[in-house]
Amino acid sequence: MPKLTPTERGIAIYNPLVLQIYDYWVLNIVNTWAWRCPTKTHLLPLFVSNIGSNHLDIGVGTGYYLANGTIPQTTRLTLCDLSPTAMAKAKARAGREDARELLCDVLKPLPVRAGEKFDSVSMYFLLHCLPGPVGNKICVFEHVKGVLKEDGVVTGATVLGKGVKDNFFGGLIRRFCVYDGIMSNETDDVESFVEALKANFEVVEVDVIGVVLVFKAMKPKL
């Protein structure tokens, strides 16, 4: 059997069984006790308060945010992910048959319609899953900038791997996730992400909660 690339390995992890338990295990237990950034306290409210009329969700996971974010039916919804399994799960949970699917790699320019711009973009727990060092990932912000309206907003969160201190449980989870290829964030630090955000957006707000970088950016630079 040929060896999987880091990207293929990351996609393979999100099989139906993992997606079945992801919300309870990751978004409830791990986020609260390992990463110390409870989903319902910090991440879901940020998502809910920043949904525009034309929204792009990158790295859809199980569709938790789409299902719990009270997105108006009038909102145009586009889902972007590299995993067909995750995409199908998220679309079903969103309850939006009209949601558009973009099966693509966010490390490459997003294959949206020519001239298409979004009011809002979300990327929760995406960056720490992308393969390679942090320098390989920051191009994502440039790609997002290119599809965001002048008055649009992008929000997200990622588990940092450098410059933060784990508790015992967090250390165990981190070592397992890195070893198993679930996360690739050993060089991911606040400074690199903030620098990349500020290079692409005029307004940048960040906070480190536990070991999670939570961010919001507006006014894409020309």
Swiss-Prot record:
Record flagged with keyword Transferase: yes
SUPFAM superfamilies with a match to the protein in the record: S-adenosyl-L-methionine-dependent methyltransferases
Alphabetized InterPro entries for the sequence: Methyltransf_12, MeTrfase_VrtF, SAM-dependent_MTases_sf
Top class in the EC scheme: transferase
Pfam families: Methyltransf_12
This enzyme's EC code(s): 2.1.1.-
GO molecular function, one term: methyltransferase activity
Gene Ontology BP annotations: methylation
Catalytic activity: emodin + S-adenosyl-L-methionine = physcion + S-adenosyl-L-homocysteine
Keyword line: Methyltransferase, S-adenosyl-L-methionine, Transferase
UniProt pathway: Secondary metabolite biosynthesis
Function of the protein: O-methyltransferase; part of the gene cluster that mediates the biosynthesis of physcion, a natural anthraquinone fungicide that can prevent plant fungal infections.
Family to which the UniProt record says this protein belongs: Belongs to the methyltransferase superfamily.
Name under which the protein is recorded: Physcion biosynthesis cluster O-methyltransferase
Species this protein is from: Aspergillus chevalieri (Eurotium chevalieri)
Classification lineage: Eukaryota, Fungi, Dikarya, Ascomycota, Pezizomycotina
Gene, per the UniProt record: AcOMT
